[in-house]
Curated annotation (Swiss-Prot):
Top EC class of this enzyme: transferase
Taxonomic classification: Bacteria, Bacillati, Bacillota, Bacilli, Bacillales
GO biological process terms held by the UniProt record: diaminopimelate biosynthetic process; lysine biosynthetic process via diaminopimelate
Protein name: 2,3,4,5-tetrahydropyridine-2,6-dicarboxylate N-acetyltransferase
EC number(s) stated in the UniProt entry for this protein: 2.3.1.89
Ranges in a coiled coil: none
A single GO molecular function term of this UniProt record: tetrahydrodipicolinate N-acetyltransferase activity
Classification via InterPro entries: DapH, DapH_N, Hexapep, Hexapep_transf_CS, Trans_hexapeptide_repeat, Trimer_LpxA-like_sf
Amino acid sequence: MVQHLSAEEIIQYISDAKKSTPLKVYVNGNFDGVTFPDSFKVFGSDNSKVIFCEADDWKPFYESNQSTITELEIEMDRRNSAIPLKDLTNTNARIEPGAFIREQAIIEDGAVVMMGATINIGAVVGEGTMIDMNATLGGRATTGKNVHVGAGAVLAGVIEPPSASPVVIDDNVLIGANAVILEGVHVGEGAIVAAGAIVTQDVPAGAVVAGTPAKVIKQTSEVEDSKREIVSALRKLND
């Protein structure tokens, strides 16, 4: 299983990161003779521009050129953000629109991350693992291979306090919709966590747990194969 960053490494990364407030600015006006700062990315025609820049750089530019601007619209979706979204260019996985994956998360080959899922810094999505819609992997949460994390499920994150242990999910585990796995819990290989369960203690390999708090109700050997099948076709990428 891939090793995640330690809590101390993540804390240092966040502390040292330059905090960013990026803007997307739509602006109309007369820009003849206007010099745009080198830090701006500027697109458009003579009288209509789209500008990508930092808020701290935009303010002095706007104050100096306000008289040339006739219309203005600004989009800002974060403030003093320390962790950018992950660059997925070289990620060999299926990532659907609307997934939020932060830098320093690890997405292994053949994984699937569905719409609305959130993968926080230091989390690991194992090879062939599916993170379903609106599921959350908190900081340092780690899954093995061929895991299914159901829609709306939460694998709690641990960055603060740094001494806390992360959630660890072994290979071939099924986690039902809206289940919650609390900090420090280890779910053993091939286990099944029922929908809506709240897991507060380690789950043995091959066990089926359900309830609040979750308790072992049977073994996976008692569950029909069709109800615990991981479908490889859903993980297939282009040939």
